[in-house]
Amino acid sequence: MLIETLSVFPEMFEPVMSTSILGRARKAGLFDFKAYNLRDWTHDRHRTVDDEPYGGGQGMLMKVEPIAEAIEAISAEGPKPTVVFFTPCGEPFTQHVAERLLKASACCLCAAVTKVSTSVPMRMPTSACRSAITCSRRRASRYGRCRCRRTPDPGALGDEMSNVDESFSTAEDGGLLEYAQYTRPAEFNGEGVPPVLVSGDHAKVDAWRRKNAIERTCRWRPDLIETARLTPEERAYAQVILDASYSQSEE
């Protein structure tokens, strides 16, 4: 089995893959590992992998072109891998999913601090979020706890406001999943950016984002709706979506 990672910090993974249980399994030939640098598939002087989101807002988004080129190049080197993209909006990454991936090569797209344009998952065979899996000595979960505790600290991020409306944040979005975000190009492989995000009308952009956040939360994490801070109108809209989803599941 071949495990691959695609990120802007490939040096992070080699120590993990060479230590403890993973290290022994790798030495025994149970799996092979490669870490790719996403910047190797950029074509500008600064090796840029991210850009500002359409519609404005804090933070940056990883661009789709370098990722698409990287996946195509990696696939050409050997068996086409299942691409695993970790996101709050996706199939729960359970132990069952992890075991299923053992049957094929897997390439994990790691976004680090920068988020990924919504255009990217449209090309992915698999999307998943971190959830119930078995980890040796819980190192991975401890790392995750350190990240979530220290990320809000002043100076940890280039723009401190970029953490405000993230998924699960209780500051601005009321505990909803984050709305879909897009960055350049405006169209990629026939998939375009929602026109409202390039309209320049900030009020309409804010309204679209709020509605989209509710829709995404209803689809992927309906359990969050009960505790989310919603207006009566928003809660009624969410209930319509949930009722429709329940009716479809019953058919």
Description of each model-found segment:
Residues 117, 121-159, 163-165, 170-171, ...:
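Structured adenosyl-cofactor binding patch, chiefly the S-adenosyl-L-methionine
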Residues 172-228:
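Long, charged alpha-helical interface segments
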Residues 211, 215-251:
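N-terminus-biased detector of the onset of the functional/mature region
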